[in-house]
Amino acid sequence: MKSVGLITEYNPFHNGHLFHATLSKQRSETNVTIAIMSGNFVMRGEPAIYHKFKRTEMALSAVDLVVELPLIGSLSSSDTFAEIAIKTAQYLDIDIISFGSESASLKDLQYLATQMIDYEKHPDFKEKLKQGKSYPRILSELTHNDTLLQSPNNILGISYLKAMQQFAPHMSALTIKREGSLHHQKVIDHHHFASGTSIRRSLMNDNVDWKNVVPNQIQSLYCKPHTTVEDTFPFIKHQLITQPKESLHSIYTINEGFENRLQTMIHRSDSFESLLSNLKTKRYTQTYIQRVLMNVLLNITKDDVNKEINAVRVLGMSEKGRSYLKYLKANYPNRHYITNVNQKTAHYFKNEIKATHVYNLLSNQSQTDFNTPLVRI
């Protein structure tokens, strides 16, 4: 069976995602579509607006199999996010990765990916990182290509292509040009497509404009968001006040010395927004800070990080997805494709199980990795 993989967050699922999934199926000429989806926390450094099981149900309106991207990938920079996603795709024997980008030229993106692999070995690159320059800024300076590197989906697409060259050279790539709204546009403009940011805002404010930009057949699944990033503040404050500096230093993604800034600024902040504002500097971007704060919230340490894939958590599937899973188990009997988390399989997913427990504290949800059955359609 030939498969196409989509690396996703679906926070929440909308018409742009449906467009991407539909074109990916058509252009890849594959039998099955697989979504590798972030769980209860997403790459922007915040809890997803809906539980991963609800988002799986939404996703199955367009794909055949949904698996969870390991938490370490979700709360990392684009390169680590991409590395873990591509390694997960490889574990699933995916043939083609399809990603959205602002550029229609796969050739240009592949050329930049190859250049970047070389540049990252260069002493100048490491020196610029030490100076506190952001990753996209360094790359645009070194490659002299501002246009392609100004777009977030291009940057992520290049990270996928780099990871494929390094870890899965047999895998093919396909890019679908994004349609409609800009990535971070805050208002729905009544066109068929809108950004995830604008849809989340509409749902939070009880504004019905979101109905114009999500598929009709799954609109009954949408409701007020389960939680927001502001809900994390009391828990983060508790962690920052009670943990010794040495423990904070061991938190995943914390750069040398940032733990001092965290412990200083928490006493000057009365909300997540004010903490973020107090922490921001030229060196530390908002997204970096938010990911650090989520790792503090979840107490994910550097020792918890494993970039190798030893098992895959299956969240949901259609009949076609079920057939593909059967194919995988027959062809890779030593791999672990887990549809039911229990005491025997829980050790593969310690970080994800912890993230679900914390998400439930934030959102008053009750679906855990142990009591929630596989989503089937």
UniProtKB/Swiss-Prot annotation:
One of its GO terms (cellular component) is cytoplasm. Keywords: ATP-binding, Cytoplasm, Ligase, Nucleotide-binding, RNA-binding, tRNA processing, tRNA-binding. Catalyzes the formation of N(4)-acetylcytidine (ac(4)C) at the wobble position of elongator tRNA(Met), using acetate and ATP as substrates. First activates an acetate ion to form acetyladenylate (Ac-AMP) and then transfers the acetyl group to tRNA to form ac(4)C34. It is found in: Cytoplasm. NCBIfam families: PRK13670.1. It is an enzyme of class 6 (ligase). It comes from Staphylococcus epidermidis (strain ATCC 12228 / FDA PCI 1200). It comes from the Bacteria. One of its GO terms (biological process) is tRNA modification. Transmembrane segments: none annotated. This is tRNA(Met) cytidine acetate ligase. It catalyses: cytidine(34) in elongator tRNA(Met) + acetate + ATP = N(4)-acetylcytidine(34) in elongator tRNA(Met) + AMP + diphosphate. ATP binds at residues 7-20, 100, 153, 178. One of its GO terms (molecular function) is ligase activity, forming carbon-nitrogen bonds. Pfam families: HIGH_NTase1. Belongs to the TmcAL family.
